[in-house]
């Protein structure tokens, strides 16, 4: 299992005060159109999030987990995936769903309790949202192991918040992935 880690206290800055890429910083080779598309997706999901929080606070919608501040991480990581890769979201990954082709209408239906909101179209390769903390981690690991055993060349990304790291499912899923060298990417968002 490969690990990429940086010191969480280390400041990460890509652009200088004038908006130019800082010297010595590696940035992905993206076209201007790709960057604009990603920015528009981040803005759209932020606006959706603001509206959904408003609906929830008005009592017009039940539980809703805001994602404010995570738009960039979600949109960028989803763009790094290939079409055949799989996503195992926690309950905040509305931006990932949008990039993968899941409509925001379907996301809203899910959080409003409508049964159509829980149906995931086959072409988006997203498993249903896992609300209990960390329960999607063993599922992602198991699916990636099955794919590996079948000789497939797919990646499986599993999103979770920092609270999941205190759960048994987190440790079991990562241990299994390490032992069997599964093609699983574990994406931990710091929700603090």
Predicted regions and their residues:
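N-terminal glycine-rich anion-binding loops that anchor highly charged ligand groups
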Residues: 12-19, 40-53
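Short, contiguous, helix-prone interaction/anchoring segments in small proteins
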Residues: 31-40
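Cofactor-binding active-site loop characterized by glycine-rich and histidine/acidic residues
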Residues: 47-50, 54, 58-180
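Short, proline-centered helix/strand-breaking motifs
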Residues: 183-184
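Short, functionally important structural connectors and interaction interfaces within domains
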Residues: 6-7, 22, 40, 53, ...
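Short coil/turn segments at secondary-structure junctions
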Residues: 26, 33, 126-127
């Amino acid at each position: 299992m490969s690990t990429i880690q940086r010191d969480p206290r280390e400041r990460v800055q890509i652009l200088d005060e004038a908006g130019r890429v800082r010297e010595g910083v590696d940035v992905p080779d993206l076209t201007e159109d790709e960057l604009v598309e990603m920015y528009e997706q981040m803005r759209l999901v932020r606006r959706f999030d603001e509206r959904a929080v408003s609906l929830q606070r008005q009592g017009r919608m039940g539980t809703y987990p805001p994602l404010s501040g995570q738009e960039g991480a979600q949109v960028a990581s989803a763009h790094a995936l290939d079409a055949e890769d799989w996503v195992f979201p926690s309950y905040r990954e509305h931006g990932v769903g949008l990039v993968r082709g899941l409509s925001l209408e379907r996301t809203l239906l899910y959080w409003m309790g409508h049964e159509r909101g829980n149906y995931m179209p086959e072409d988006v390769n997203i498993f249903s949202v896992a609300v209990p903390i960390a329960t999607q981690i063993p599922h992602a690991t198991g699916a990636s192991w099955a794919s590996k055993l079948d000789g497939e060349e797919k990646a499986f990304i599993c999103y979770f918040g920092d609270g999941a790291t205190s759960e048994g499912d987190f440790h079991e899923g990562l241990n299994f992935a390490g032992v069997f060298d599964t093609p699983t990417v574990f994406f931990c968002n710091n929700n603090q």
